[in-house]
Amino acid sequence: MTETNQIFRCNVCGNIVEVLNPGAGQLVCCNQPMELLVARRTDVGPEKHVPVVEETGTGIRVKVGEVPHPMEENHHIQWIEVIAGDMVYRKDLNPGDNPEAEFPVEMASDFMVRIYCNIHGLWY
């Protein structure tokens, strides 16, 4: 059984999917079950992976890590996502970009931030 906003990855081709509508079936890609990614806060380099949230005049700014995460071709943050109530905001990033993004979410509201590193996976 899948749940809304879960993230799955294909360990063969690298496809990543986010569940929009939960269902009873198993997600399969390349003839293999997809791996459920579990966001973490500790492990390899938390100082470069844990999102840091700051208030701005129009919402929040999310920076990836207390120490800015590398944004190189072979190691970078692919996206930053904020889930606030029934809204999902996502900023796709590319090598060379700054590992940060701004979102129109009030700091006082209830929200969740997560990021995806192409090497070290999902973080919150």
UniProtKB/Swiss-Prot annotation:
Gene3D superfamilies: Desulphoferrodoxin, N-terminal domain, SOR catalytic domain. It holds the Pfam family Desulfoferrodox. One of its GO terms (biological process) is removal of superoxide radicals. Binds 1 Fe(3+) ion per subunit. The iron ion 1 is coordinated via 4 cysteine residues. Binds 1 Fe(2+) ion per subunit. The iron ion 2 is coordinated via four histidines and one cysteine residue. The keyword Transport applies. GO terms for molecular function: iron ion binding; oxidoreductase activity. Fe cation 2 binds at residues 49, 69, 75, 117, 120. InterPro entries: Desulfoferrodoxin_Fe-bd_dom, Desulfoferrodoxin_Fe-bd_dom_sf, Desulfoferrodoxin_N, Desulfoferrodoxin_N_sf, Desulfoferrodoxin_rbo, Desulfoferrodoxin_SOR. Its cofactor is Fe(3+); Cu(2+). Belongs to the desulfoferrodoxin family. This is Desulfoferrodoxin homolog. It comes from Methanothermobacter thermautotrophicus (strain ATCC 29096 / DSM 1053 / JCM 10044 / NBRC 100330 / Delta H) (Methanobacterium thermoautotrophicum). The lineage of its organism: Archaea, Methanobacteriati, Methanobacteriota, Methanomada group, Methanobacteria.
